[in-house]
Amino acid sequence: MPQIFHHSTNALAKITIYGAVFIGVALLWVAVELNRSSWNTGQWVEKQQPVQFSHKHHVGDDGIDCRYCHTSVETAASAGMPSTNTCMNCHKQIWADSPYLEPVRASFRTGKPIEWIRVHDLPDYSYFNHSIHVKQGVGCATCHGRIDQMNFVYQASPLTMEWCLNCHRNPEKYIRPREEVFNMAYVAKNQEVLGPRLVKEYGVNKLTSCSVCHY
């Protein structure tokens, strides 16, 4: 019986199979890298705000404590955004006529809040509580980076589940004394010794169950 296919068909079939496997692996790699990239996570992306507010100036230069503006960070899930009343406590006297602060003055006069652009935007299916993390010795800079050095706030961490779990599985690597939580420049001298001691002292558990963050 004569052959229907040319003998070169075997080689072509092998090339097709190997090529399909290669393309599949390549597409999977691209998908994983895209998922981790700033294009998807928003990491390192500066967002222009309605008011040119500089944390470097207010926190780094003037030494204003995080809690002066983010008043509920120790007591609630949300750290809280300051009302323009908080801004005007200082800016009634300082830069009172600056054109850059006109949106702040307008908000103060009308009572209409400034529509800030959210930088750290977690999915609706994820639950995060600032007060719990603060009480357990997780510093602001651990998640937000050196806010005191940012002219415009950007997302310093990827905020992916993998990133969160790195800390939840190994809290001793990241935890700090509670009195240093709001110290942006804090660096532990001996984290290998201090971390495990604080984990035990603060009763920190390695919580990795899905229901901890996803209700």
Model-derived regions, located:
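N-terminal export/targeting leaders of redox proteins
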Residues: 1-52, 56-60, 64, 68, ...
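Primarily the internal scaffold of c-type cytochrome electron-transfer domains
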Residues: 4-6, 94-126, 173-215
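A short, flexible N-terminal coil/short beta segment enriched in small residues
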Residues: 18-22, 90-95, 99
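Nucleotide phosphate-binding site architecture
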Residues: 59, 88, 134
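The canonical Cys-X-X-Cys-His
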Residues: 63-72, 84-94, 140-146, 163-170, ...
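Short Cys/His-rich "knuckle" micro-motifs
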Residues: 76-80, 97-101, 150-154, 174-177
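Soluble extracytoplasmic domains of inner/organellar membrane proteins
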Residues: 124, 132-178
